[in-house]
């Protein structure tokens, strides 16, 4: 019974090593990409960012 357990463990290790080496063909950066935060200041930062992009008519608001 002990030899069977060791054989099963060795087979599991070899199989997991093969899966890690081969992978599934996708790049982790593509699959798990996180969108960039264009507005790190939250809602007020987003408002100021929109004003800057649209050509703010009032200079003190644009910063």
UniProtKB/Swiss-Prot annotation:
Record-level Gene Ontology MF annotations: ion channel inhibitor activity; toxin activity
PROSITE patterns: CONTRYPHAN
Tissue expression profile of the protein: Expressed by the venom duct.
Prodomain positions: 24-54
Region Disordered, annotated ranges: 24-48
Extent of the signal sequence: 1-23
Subcellular location: Secreted
Alphabetized InterPro entries for the sequence: Conotoxin, Contryphan_CS
GO cellular component, one term: extracellular region
Family, as annotated: Belongs to the O2 superfamily. Contryphan family.
Protein name: Contryphan-R
Protein source organism: Conus radiatus
């Amino acid at each position: 019974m002990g030899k069977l357990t060791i054989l099963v463990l060795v087979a599991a290790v070899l199989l997991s090593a093969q899966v890690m080496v081969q992978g599934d063909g996708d790049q982790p950066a593509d699959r798990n990409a996180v969108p960039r935060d264009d507005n790190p200041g939250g809602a007020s930062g987003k408002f100021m960012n929109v004003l800057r992009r649209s050509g703010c008519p009032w200079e003190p608001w644009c910063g």
